[in-house]
Amino acid sequence: MIPARMASTRFFGKPLELVAGIPMVVYCAKNAEETGLDVYVCTDSRDIQTTCDSYNIKSILTPECATGTDRVNIAMNEIDSKFVINLQGDEPLLTSKLLNKIITMMPILNHFDDKIITGVEPIEDPSDINDVKCVLIGHKVHYFSRHPISNYKQVGVYAMSKSNLKKFASLPQGELEKREKVELLRWIENGFDILGCDLNSNTISVDIPSDLKKVNLML
């Protein structure tokens, strides 16, 4: 499930900006489709939905939502599945090979239903506030911050059970989530575990226009 909205505060309209000649949200969806799983874009924008239709990408229209995970939760009401992967629509460098690393780790969720898996990767410069850094000990993520607290960052993909998705959406936002503007802190603040899947990659999340230029130079 790929949540996408036009009203990004740092880069308005970025889902429809071009990556390698096609809209970024479509590029992300096509990467995800290469895993063989069913892929949907969930959005409150009819422009995004129309664009997805033109590329034969399945989409679900939702109301406005506070976070991408809240949007995925609403969209999943229409999908019969025990598990869900939330892939951010601004991660065009997350290839099917990298997504398959997350998928390979997902059987853990059959035995530990209170856990969420997120992608992580090493970074050389932790000073960029657009990158969400994470404190990783073993496979467990202990904290997320936009401050330079470690040399690992969170990558915009996470897997969980559908029941945990609903639980996540029902939990109140805590002070840490509000302060750091990192939604996965909600799970940690409420006493649950997040596991990091080291993708051992070098991806770029498109947060601002200059990121888009970097991504297109890499493709």
What do these predicted regions represent?
Residues 40, 46-104:
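Short phosphate-binding loop-to-helix
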Residues 36, 81, 109-116, 192:
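Short, high-confidence coil segments that cap the C-terminus of an alpha-helix
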Residues 16, 134-136, 196:
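A structural signal for short hydrophobic beta-strand segments in well-ordered beta-sheet cores
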Residues 1-43:
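N-terminal glycine-rich phosphate-binding loop and ensuing alpha1 helix
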